[in-house]
Amino acid sequence: MIHLKKIIFFLIFSILVSCSSIPKNTQNSCAIFEERYLWYKHAKASYEKWGAPIHLQLAFVKKESDFDWLAKPPRKKLFKVIPFKRPSSSFGYSQAVKGTWEQYKRETNNPLATRVRFKDSVDFIGWYIHKTNKILRISKKDAYK
């Protein structure tokens, strides 16, 4: 019974996630939030929880994945022709690698978080900025360090 519920959950989740597309204008945060109002709510919630500025969260997503929810690093080429392994396990909006993502899920007690959900990705970015601030003493508002 539990196995069936998991399958149904992942089928519904897959259908809903596949409806996501890249915003039309990724250069303008106001245009992004006009097009995707829930993204603003998620980014604001991450700001309130972790103190990571919304503009910095969007800068991370823009730089890492250009708002492509299925972004992955390009494959290496074998003999300069045959697609081979990817250089890392980074994936999704935040391009979080698997190990760091697992640490985030453990520390935030959020085992259902996925790298393809914008909500989870901006929460991860907020958590990451918060951890960086705590450990390295880099300002949460400093996008250049």
Predicted regions and their residues:
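Sec-dependent signal peptide recognition
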Residues: 3-12
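Catalytic glycan-binding domains that act on GlcNAc-containing polysaccharides
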Residues: 21-145
